[in-house]
Swiss-Prot record:
SUPFAM superfamilies: FMT C-terminal domain-like (SSF50486), Formyltransferase (SSF53328)
Function: Attaches a formyl group to the free amino group of methionyl-tRNA(fMet). The formyl group appears to play a dual role in the initiator identity of N-formylmethionyl-tRNA by promoting its recognition by IF2 and preventing the misappropriation of this tRNA by the elongation apparatus.
GO molecular function: methionyl-tRNA formyltransferase activity
Lineage: Bacteria, Bacillati, Mycoplasmatota, Mycoplasmoidales, Mycoplasmoidaceae
The organism of origin for this protein: Ureaplasma parvum serovar 3 (strain ATCC 700970)
Protein name as catalogued: Methionyl-tRNA formyltransferase
Pfam families: Formyl_trans_C, Formyl_trans_N
Residues at which (6S)-5,6,7,8-tetrahydrofolate binds: 110-113
Amino acid sequence: MKYKVMFFGTPEIAKIVLETLFNMHEVDLIAVVSQPDAHFDRKKNVIYSPVKQFCLDHNIKLFQPEKIKEIEEEIRILGPDIIITCAFGQFINQGIIDIPKYKIVNIHASLLPKLRGGAPIHYAILNGELKTGITLMHTIKKMDAGNILFQRSLEINDCTTTKSLTLELANLSALMIKEHFLELVKPNLVGIQQDENSVSFAYNIQKDQNIINFDQPAFFINRFVNAMYDKPIAIMQYNGVSIKVYQVKITNQKSCQKPGTIMIFKNQLFVSTQDFDIELLLIQLPNKKPLSPKVLLNGKNPFIN
């Protein structure tokens, strides 16, 4: 038996789940809903989101409403048995929540009730969590507060970045949807209520929240840089210039200079922090490519006044 499925999502993590649904024999993928086009290249050509590109490549019906409520009637006419969402980016109104026979199942990239919100992967790293994971949950009007259906965890280490963790969680999401799909379309699936006393939040990263504060311990700065990679990328300010920082390493050298002081030693760049110096391993000056300090310092040294 095939079930009529609609999918809501936009970025790469959602595309990997969409691809899995597209290839499942039990799924009749009737339509996809994604965010409106929002990114453009230097020539002002539209850059399609991963989900939109997949839909175009595979001739899948696609909606891109400014507000999901705009297409409530179209969704009602399509009559999905179940709607699956992943990193969609819009609140879903109650009218749409009530449409599918087997409800809306959201794929959330944290171990709920921890880290409700739009940036759970970033904050799992920022908060120093030792593990995170994927939660399949029923969608209700309150953000990420529905009953937990299934969860699976994975470990985080000091080298984990948002980019690497997103890929791991995307693959885990796809695996869980494949394994649990037939359970998701059972009418008696209720799940477990979330413990409201254990709730924490991971709101979207805002402009200027990616600026490094070197008046912090080195371990936190390392964590911060990892959390901001590869989007939006950590920024350090130097003489009024914003320098992107992709990768750092904590040293054993106690910081003797004022936090934020840049030091050059044998074609290496170090920055003092609250406790230990950190080494800058990969950085990017404005309008330049990301470079190692060794390559950068072989040219004109931007760190000498």
